[in-house]
């Protein structure tokens, strides 16, 4: 393996939406940083079978519906 071409691989903390924190190794951030997730497998509709509501961070869904809502209406 070539030397000095790979990113630094270090420990970070990952905080889930319910506040649970676990430690893993990653190339993201710096040693000891905390990655806060907006959505995770416990609340994402793809993994929960659509049982939970998707959080609209920043009003992106509302902005999309405002721009393209007319195209989605059934005729």
Swiss-Prot record:
Protein's name according to its UniProt entry: Large ribosomal subunit protein bL31
Gene Ontology cellular-component annotations: ribonucleoprotein complex; ribosome
This protein's encoding gene: rpmE
Organism domain of life: Bacteria
Protein task: Binds the 23S rRNA.
Record PROSITE patterns: RIBOSOMAL_L31 (PS01143)
Record Pfam families: Ribosomal_L31 (PF01197)
GO biological process: translation
């Amino acid at each position: 393996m070539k030397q000095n071409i790979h990113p630094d691989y270090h420990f970070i903390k990952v905080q889930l939406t319910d506040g649970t924190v676990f430690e893993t190794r990653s190339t993201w951030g710096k040693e000891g940083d905390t990655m806060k997730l907006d959505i995770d497998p416990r609340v994402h509709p793809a993994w929960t079978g659509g049982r939970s509501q998707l959080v609209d961070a920043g009003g992106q869904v509302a902005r999309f519906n405002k721009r393209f809502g007319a195209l989605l209406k059934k005729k």
